[in-house]
Design a protein with these regions (language model features):
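Glycine-rich phosphate-binding loops of NTPases
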Residues: 45-70, 80-204, 266-274
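Extended helical coiled-coil dimerization/tether regions that scaffold
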Residues: 176-179, 188-287, 291-303
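Switch/communication elements of ASCE P-loop NTPase nucleotide-binding domains
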Residues: 1-40, 259-386, 393, 402-410
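Short helix-loop-beta junction
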Residues: 408-421
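Short glycine-/polar-rich loops that comprise or flank the Walker A/P-loop
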Residues: 69-73, 118-122, 160-164, 300-301, ...
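Flexible glycine-/small-residue-rich
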Residues: 75-79, 168-171, 246, 260-262, ...
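Membrane-embedded alpha-helical bundles of multi-pass transporters/translocases
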Residues: 13-66, 70-74
Length: 421
């Protein structure tokens, strides 16, 4: 990845199940957003596709060479299913899982090795368009290259075959439970292939739904019609009446809302329902994760990328949901600071991210020296979790020094907060 936001250059590999750990502003969200630019089916429909702040240090034109500085992001999707191999048959390459590299010019026999599998290489290219004074970008297959040096476009229907779903922290509960394009409910309807007739059926019902037919509103609309007829022919403003909306699919997508029971009862004994946005934060997040589980069951291969899945969820729910999504998905990528989430992953499945001068590195965690797996799991929350998430470590001789240093740090923060933070 070259030139994305806070990251100038990186090369990160993810195992099939992993958690990205690191300090705040290390680039975890930037990394997932970069992959979303390549694999997200609805991402390129956003306008503009990229903006000034997506370029490293905001530099999209080299001040010395006066040349446009591009954003280039390449993603290798390995472990393709049989269906995916058939669909992407013209773009297949071979990935060596042991060497962590693509086979180049290898004899055909090497592709039969157990650690070698079909893969696909795609990339995003974004740039500043000088003539239009705007930003552009698109996604392409890395192979094959056409005779004129260009590349075939990697389209939204092709991206849906990859099954990549990215849930940002801020997105959870805002539009995931709506029917807007790219929302989780929209993805489920597409997978169930029920969207073709659903919208037309809803429009037919709304066209026949009487709205505003009380006597007062009827008199008002009749007065409007009479007033208009003084100036224009009668057929220009015939029969004014009200509908719940302008009766278009896009309006329905924006306005249809999921209601849920609140547990409160109305005077007539019926259960009072409210829009899902009025539910508790933990309830909304659990609903979103439940929708992800449905998608995983409907789709053969799903790649989940999720930020902070533990927000507003109790520890036992965090564990249950994380394990469920890992079992049902082809690949699950999380970013989390929760010890209850981190302890569900083996050290090799925790990728520790660091960013120095715009260069990002990712290193799989390993068992500490002389620490056995049983002791690691037993003491993870009290001893090892903070070491994974901290920027630096201070090794002390014993518990007395540890407690004394922590107390001194708190006291310094109270006495001189501007000097000691």
């Amino acid at each position: 990845m070259l030139g994305q936001e806070l990251v100038r250059r990186n090369a990160i590999g993810w195992p099939s199940q992993c958690n990205c750990a690191g300090d705040n502003n290390a680039g975890k969200s930037t990394l997932l957003e970069a992959v979303d630019l390549v694999l997200g089916p609805e991402r390129l429909s956003r306008r503009p596709v990229i903006d000034e702040h997506d370029f490293y240090a905001g530099t999209y034109v080299d001040p010395v060479k006066k040349e446009v500085v591009p954003i280039q992001i390449e993603v290798i999707v390995a472990g393709l299913s049989d269906e995916q191999q058939r669909h992407f048959r013209d773009h297949i390459e071979w990935w060596d899982a042991q060497a962590k590299t693509l086979l180049v010019g290898a004899p055909p026999e090497r592709t039969d090795a157990p650690h070698v599998g079909a893969a696909m290489r795609v990339f995003f290219n974004g740039w500043y368009d000088v003539e239009e004074d705007d930003f552009s970008g698109d996604t392409y297959y890395a192979t094959p290259e056409t005779p004129d040096g260009s590349y075939l476009r990697f389209s939204a229907p092709d991206k849906r075959k990859c099954g990549f779903l990215y849930l940002r922290t801020l997105r959870t509960g805002t539009r995931a439970l709506s029917l807007e394009r790219g929302s989780l409910l929209d993805v489920i309807l597409r997978l169930k292939e029920t969207r073709l007739t659903m919208w037309e059926d809803l429009l037919d019902q709304l066209r026949a739904l009487p709205v505003g037919e009380t006597e007062d509103i009827g008199e008002l609309l009749a007065a409007v019609q009479d007033a208009v007829r003084h100036y224009v022919p009668s057929d220009w403003a015939e029969d004014p009446h009200m509908r719940v909306s302008d009766l278009t699919r896009d309006t329905l997508r924006r306005t249809l809302t999921v209601f849920m029971g609140t547990g409160a009862k109305r005077p007539d004994g019926s259960v009072y329902s409210a829009p899902y946005q009025h539910q508790g934060t933990g309830t909304i997040n659990t609903l979103v994760l439940a929708l992800l589980s449905i998608i995983a069951e409907l789709k053969q291969s799903v790649i989940f990328a999720m930020e902070e899945p533990e927000i507003a969820l109790p520890p036992h729910t965090q564990k249950r949901i994380i394990n469920s999504l890992r079992q049902k998905s082809a690949q699950a990528i999380f970013t989390s600071h929760s010890p209850y989430v981190l302890e569900e992953f083996e050290p090799a499945q925790v990728v520790v991210l660091k960013r120095v001068a715009g260069v990002m590195t990712g290193i799989p965690a390993t068992y500490p020296p002389s620490v056995k797996p049983k002791a690691y799991r037993t003491d993870f929350r009290t001893r090892f979790c903070e070491a994974l998430l901290a920027r630096s470590l201070l090794v002390l001789e014993g518990r007395t020094e540890s407690d004394a240093l922590a107390a001194a740090a708190r006291l310094h923060g109270e006495v001189a907060p501007t000097r000691f933070k």
